[in-house]
Amino acid sequence: ADVKGTARVNVTGGTLKGVVGGGLSYLYTIAALTDAAVTTDVKNVAVNITGGTINAMDHNSGLDGFGIPASVVGGGVAYSKSTVTTNKVEATVGNVDMTIAGKGAKLSGDIYAGGFAHGAKTAASVNSTRLTIADATLGAADSQVNVFAGGYAAQGATSTVKTSEVTIANSKIFGNVYGGGNKADAQSNVTVESSVITLDGADVTGIVSTESFEPSVNAALMRLAEADTGAGDAEANKPQRTINLINSKMGTLQISAKQDTETSLYLVGSNTVGEITGGKASEIVFDGTGTPAGEAILTLTKEGASFD
């Protein structure tokens, strides 16, 4: 079914096995069915989570059961068991606006601003996403919750997000924050064309990365302040990553290691960064004020970035 208006999901309490903002497109058969088309199209999605316990998804239709390694998926879910390449399974969403706010919300799985896709010729796409996490504590020392600006793809599927904005304000994340998506295998494809990550007074215990487990962001701008204090226009045909740290805290800052990527790092105020990784193949430009907390001295060169 398609939704021409806005699909709204409000969670204030209770216990759930996952939240999906978009539609569900399923093709269960593994028989020789050809030219099948299963599609859903949702124009707008609005998700507001202020309470409740949301566990990782465990779906069972009665015909087939499968798990989704996430508590929240902003886009839709496209799932297929068929291996016939003439079949088509798609879940499309126009715009996603998702908020997770307050100490009452408890999540045990990851958060994807984009959609979930599983199976050959299966695709989940989102035009734009906006995820806001405010005044929250997500995860625990023994239970990570990772945040992805993009979606998830497995078994030869494709998940795409055109533009994504992730804002984490006055919150603690026991896990990692990625400017890209996540794919389970080399046959799958995950893409985020452009992403903005803003960390304002956030404490991320793990990695803050311009990319994901595998590079999937074509153009990323990371901000750690209310205002953009980044560099100017990127050189022609050269992706640019801008990272602004203003009174922020994280375990590891992971910058792009793509050879054609220029990364600019700005430090203002008191920032605690355990280590910086990546960038060995990048041209790294340092232009800012402030130093990391502690006794470490920040070193940035074209060969890499590290603490001495």
Q: Which residues make up each language-model segment?
A:
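Surface-exposed loop/turn motifs in large extracellular/passenger domains
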Residues: 1-110, 115-146, 150-176, 182-308
